[in-house]
Amino acid sequence: MKLILLFSTVLFSFSALNQTQGIAYTAVGKGVATTFVTDYHCLGINTSALGWGTGYSGKHTTLGMTEFGFGVYSDAMNSAKLKKFFGAVKDQAFGTNPTPYDWNAQREAAGDYAQAGVSMFLNLNWFGFAYQNEKLGGIAFNVQENYQWYSKFNQQTTDILFRGKFSSYFDSLQIAVNGDTSMIANSANLSADTLNSVILGSISVPLKLSAITNGSEIRSVWNRYYNFGYGRKIFGKDSVFVVYGGVGGRFIQSMAMFNMESNESGLYMYSSVTPRFNIDYGNVALSNPSTIMQSGNFPKSVGNGYGIDLSLSAILFNKLKIAASINNIGQVVYNRNVYKVNDTLLTQVTVNGLSDYNVTQSINQLLRDGGLLSLQGEEKYVLKNAADFRVGASMDFGKIFTVGVDIVAPFDRSRPGSITNPVFSVGGELRPTKWLCLSAGYFGGGIYKSNIPVGIRFVLKNGAYEFGVSSYDALSFFMNNSNSFSAAMGVARFRF
C-alpha cells in the first residue's frame, strides 16, 4: 500500500513540524512556540496570541503559504539509518523504483527496526490568513495537512513484516514448480531459485497474533485541518499587566488512520484507510458495512471530526509573556473502510515482505489479504483526538533578544498522532539587525533524546515579507549517531 504516496508527492513537489511547534517554521529553530507564535501560526498552539498584534507597526494582516516541514526520530536508530528510511519514503513519493531488497537485505533491515521506536511527521500549510487589531482582537484561519507515524515492533513481528512468507517464524514453505506444488522445510540455506518459487509460508504449531506481536505498536494518522481562531485582550493596563483569552477550533478530514497496540492484555487494532491506496482486503471487504470504492483522482476521506482549543495568556511590563492552552479536544468518526483485528492463530501468509527500508509500508503487510492480521469489517470507529496541554513563558530583552521555555504534554499518549510523553524545551531568538533573526534551543522528552534546533529568518521591509529555514536538530547534519533528521521552511509570508 502506498500509504503516503500522494501526500508525500505534494510536499516534495514544493521543495515541520512536530506538534510541539505546529506548522510554525518561525518557532521550529527555537524549539519553543507557546509565547512566540502569532497570527495564523498560533492556531492549535495558543490562540490568545491573536490579541497581541502582529508585532510590526501599521501592519494588521498576515498571509502565508508554501510552509512545510518534516522530521524523523528514533530512540534507537541513528541519523544515517533515519535518512535511509526517509530516502525510501521520498523514492516512493517521486515514483522512483530502486532495486528491491533481496532476502539478505530484508533480514538486515528487520534487525535495524527490531525494538526501535520510530516517529515521523510531514506537515504542509496550504494557506494561512490572520487579521489583528488592537480594539477587535485577532482572527485567523489556515488549512493544514498533517501526517504522523509512530511504530515499534518486537523482533518476531519485524521479521515477519520485512521477510513475509520467508520469515523464520514459518517452519515450512510451499513452492510451485511447473504447475506442481509441494512443501519443503524453511531454511536459511535455500537457493535463490527455490526462494523464487515459494508461494506461502506456514507453521505446524501456530501462535496467536497477540503472542506474536506482544510489545509492538503502530499509531498513524493522516489528517487535513481547517483551523480557525479568535483572541483578544480581556482586561489590564498595557504597560503593567494584561490578560488575553483565545478560542479556536477545526474541522477535520481524515484520509487514513491505523491504531494498533499489542501487550499483555491482548491485541487491539482499528484501521480506516482511503481507498485511493488500493489495499486488497480480499473477501472480508464484501461483508464490511463501511466498504467504499475509489472514484476520481483525489483520495476520499474516511472520517470527519472536530477539535476545540482554549487558551489564556498574560503580558507583564511589556516584557514577560506567560501562556497556557488546551488544544484539539474532540474526536473523529471513521465510517469508511473500517476494520478491526481478530486475535486468531497465524498459520500462513503469502506476502513477500517489505521490499525496501520504508517501514510505513508495513500497514500493507498487516491489512492486505494473505497478510499478517485477520480482519473483521466494522460500521464505524470513534477516535479521540491527539489533544495536548501546554504552558510556556518568555522574556524580551529589548528588541535584540528573547528567550523562553515550553512544556507540552499529551492528554492520552495512546491516541494516534500524540506525543508519547511530555516534551520540555528552552530556546530563544537573536535579532542583530532589523532584517535578520537567528534562533537556537534545546528540547527533549517524548521519544526524543537531546535535540538542538536552529533556524534563520529574514524579515524585509519592516515585516512586509518574510522567509526562513529551520531544523529540529542541527546535530543530525554533522553526526551519524544523532537520533533525528528534520527540516522546516517557509518562503511566502506577507504582512500589510
Model regions and ranges:
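Absolute protein N-terminus
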Residues: 1, 18-19
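Sec-dependent N-terminal signal peptides
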Residues: 3-14
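Subset of outer-membrane beta-barrel
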Residues: 19-496
